[in-house]
Amino acid sequence: MKVLNELRQFYPLDELLRAAEIPRSTFYYHLKALSKPDKYADVKKRISEIYHENRGRYGYRRVTLSLHREGKQINHKAVQRLMGTLSLKAAIKVKRYRSYRGEVGQTAPNVLQRDFKATRPNEKWVTDVTEFAVNGRKLYLSPVIDLFNNEVISYSLSERPVMNMVENMLDQAFKKLNPHEHPVLHSDQGWQYRMRRYQNILKEHGIKQSMSRKGNCLDNAVVECFFGTLKSECFYLDEFSNISELKDAVTEYIEYYNSRRISLKLKGLTPIEYRNQTYMPRV
């Protein structure tokens, strides 16, 4: 209708309506609607800001939760429609994720048994290693994730999948523990977790080791899901010319994931917000 109205200065309206096969009443109805103030103008502006602040990682559900956090009452269907009018769509590149494997062989039972729900921080941890490739070189990430709020509580980056990478990750994680806390630490059957050195470190800190069954990636689904999210929202969205750039991007993303990226499963809170708002530590 806007285009037809602009063309009126060059052509008779009747000819334009006839060519467009639009009744005169319909034309004036929409013309009147166009002249009204847009009641969603402020909301659309904020939707666009939220979308771009998160680099296009948010779909309409997370955008809706972000608006709710700011006190704006609007349902997800309206947000979905408004994002459509703004041509805003989550810019996530979904690819089939394959985690880093290496040699497998079990040395500990599956204590976790796919029970990924934790009632307090530092009750259940999960870990694994994933790899990235940039121009023929590789980068490995080894994190510890707390199942209470899916927070990455420690991590280590290395250009080689060495035991020292895992030990550095553990050292960081142990600093988060209070004296009375002895979590279960679940992993797959990777060679790092079968090393006597790894097992002794866990025993020294009162950590109970748990391992997935052979060939069952769902036994460690939370950390696998995190790797998939990390690669979709960080690695696949940019092009990296070297490992140094990738290290910086992964470091920035983990900070974003913990402190700024809201989670649907955490009632619209970030992992750190959820921990701070829902758990009262034991004195």
Curated annotation (Swiss-Prot):
List the InterPro entries hit by this protein, alphabetically. Answer: HTH-like_dom, Integrase_cat-core, RNaseH-like_sf, RNaseH_sf, Transpos_IS3, Transposase_IS3/IS150/IS904
Q: List each copy of the Integrase catalytic domain by range.
A: 117-279
Going by the entry's taxonomy, the superkingdom of the source organism is recorded as Bacteria
* Induction record: A shorter open reading frame encoding a protein called DinS, encoded by a 0.4 kb mRNA encoded within the insK transcript, is repressed by LexA, induced by DNA damage.
Q: Which SUPFAM superfamilies match?
A: Ribonuclease H-like (SSF53098)
Q: Which gene encodes it?
A: insK
Name the chain's protein.
Answer: Putative transposase InsK for insertion sequence element IS150
Pfam families recorded for this chain?
A: HTH_21, rve, rve_2
Species in which this protein is naturally found: Escherichia coli (strain K12)
Main function: Involved in the transposition of the insertion sequence IS150.
Which biological process, per GO, is one annotated for this protein? DNA integration
Instruction: Spell out the molecular function terms from Gene Ontology.
Output: DNA binding
Give UniProt keywords alphabetically.
DNA recombination, DNA-binding, Transposable element, Transposition
Family the entry assigns: Belongs to the transposase IS3/IS150/IS904 family.
